[in-house]
């Protein structure tokens, strides 16, 4: 019966290339007891131009990495253009380590035409033909990975969907969770677990002793919450490949939380511990945060220091050390408090957008990143205020249960 349930959830048997990763083949030879996995969200290419952006940035970078054991793509490989799915999967299959994928809400066939949305919702026909599986599970290095489709379309329209599992999926998940006792179980979906309908019924399936990590994409912002615990990895397309292009011709595409386009690296230990780092695409691995001098609203002559930790958690702790000013004056360390402010990077984009004329926007539409002011989950500010010249740089120390950062960074 359990075998029938498992087969009912897959289109075909998982391809041998991808299954080899579950058995330990491919990728680098594991160093010690650490399994290194890239968690990649939303390349979401819409046409050949955007496919070129992805090839020359995130896919090229992933291809060049030799420190990875495995990669999991968390959905939205394409943006409703299913003709690009075969090329996307070919590129992913060319990476020098096993890769796995979950489908996103844009990785589905769209049936257009008169009344088509009323009679036939999106489905995974092309995904099943090209990828070959939907839900799958495997254990590697004492970590159990469960990859599941949690995008549920209703029959009322092609764009109407919610996050959640069917009852059949829950039965399958229950059977998987009760086999063996790995140190950690990673549930990978497209829509964040915290946004799923019926998540309490899913939590009820998890054995009390099972340690979980929920990872996802979908939102185009980065967020970490230890109360679940949940990791929303952001989007490698950023804000849908929009923005001014860099020297390589790749759009800036800042995410709405203020994090650059990027992905997470997770180092899983055999005892269930894991370490995380955020990797900005096309930037040095050490570049994991930014620092800003933000004028006080009531006194423009004074300012507070603001830190954006691109992959930071809501329980993170930030300290900023300001360099000494003048001979005999020692630098001082300041504890920061988490803020619900809009990221300074987003504020900068909003100011840039406001400076554009209507005619310029019309002729340079793709340079316009449609960002609005909204709280970012990984912004910290000093409780102390400062006056006088802004420091050229600060030293930032960040830590949470799974991430440690020490970085000297220029103040913007």
Could you tell me what each predicted segment is?
Residues 344-383:
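Aromatic sugar-binding surface patches on proteins
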Residues 74, 176-195:
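Short acidic, glycine-rich surface-loop motifs adjacent to enzyme active sites
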Residues 82-181, 198-215, 219-269, 274-277:
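Extended active-site neighborhood of metal-dependent phosphoesterases/phosphodiesterases
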Residues 228-324, 379-401, 405-408:
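Binuclear metal-dependent phosphoesterase catalytic core
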Residues 17-87, 388-393, 412:
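N-terminal active-site segment of His-dependent metallophosphoesterases
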Residues 42, 75-76, 104-105, 190, ...:
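Active-site glycine-centered loops adjacent to acidic/histidine catalytic or metal-binding residues
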Residues 316-356:
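Extended low-complexity, serine/threonine- and proline-enriched intrinsically disordered segments
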Residues 2-8:
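Sec-dependent signal peptide recognition
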């Amino acid at each position: 019966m359990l075998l029938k349930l498992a087969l009912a959830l897959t289109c075909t048997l998982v391809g041998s290339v991808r299954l080899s990763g579950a058995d330990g083949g491919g990728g680098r030879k594991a160093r010690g007891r650490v399994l290194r996995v890239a968690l990649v969200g939303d390349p979401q290419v819409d046409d050949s131009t955007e496919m070129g952006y992805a090839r020359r940035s995130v896919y090229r970078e992933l291809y060049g990495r030799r420190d990875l054991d495995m990669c999991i793509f968390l959905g939205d490989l394409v943006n409703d253009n299913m003709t690009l799915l075969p090329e996307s999967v070919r590129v992913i299959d060319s990476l020098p380590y096993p890769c796995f994928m979950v489908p996103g809400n844009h990785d589905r066939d769209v049936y257009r035409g008169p009344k088509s949305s009323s009679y036939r919702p999106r489905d995974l026909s092309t995904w099943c033909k090209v990828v070959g599986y939907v839900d799958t599970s495997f254990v590697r290095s004492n970590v159990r990975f469960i990859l599941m489709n949690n995008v549920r379309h209703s029959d009322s329209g092609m764009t109407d969907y919610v996050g959640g599992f069917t009852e059949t999926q829950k039965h399958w998940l229950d059977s998987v969770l009760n086999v063996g006792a790995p140190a950690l179980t990673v549930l990978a979906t497209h829509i964040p677990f915290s946004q799923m309908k019926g998540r309490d019924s899913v939590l009820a399936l998890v054995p009390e002793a099972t340690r979980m990590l929920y990872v996802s994409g979908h939102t185009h912002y980065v967020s970490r919450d230890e109360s679940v615990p949940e990791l929303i990895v952001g989007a490698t397309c950023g804000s849908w490949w929009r923005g001014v292009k860099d020297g390589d011709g790749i759009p800036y595409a800042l995410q709405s939380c203020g994090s650059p386009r990027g992905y997470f690296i997770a180092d899983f230990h055999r005892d269930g511990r894991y370490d995380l780092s955020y990797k900005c695409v096309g930037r040095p691995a050490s570049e994991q945060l930014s620092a800003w001098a933000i004028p006080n609203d009531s006194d423009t002559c004074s300012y507070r220091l603001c830190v954006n930790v691109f992959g930071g958690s809501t329980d993170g702790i930030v300290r900023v050390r300001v360099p000494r000013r003048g001979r005999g004056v020692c630098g001082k360390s300041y504890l920061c408090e988490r803020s619900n402010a809009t990221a300074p990077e987003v504020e900068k984009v909003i100011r840039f957008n406001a400076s554009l004329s209507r005619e310029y926007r019309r002729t340079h539409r793709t340079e316009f990143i449609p960002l609005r002011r909204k709280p970012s989950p990984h912004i910290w500010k000093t409780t102390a205020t400062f006056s006088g010249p802004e420091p050229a740089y600060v030293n930032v120390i960040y830590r949470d249960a799974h991430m440690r950062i020490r970085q000297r960074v220029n103040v913007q």
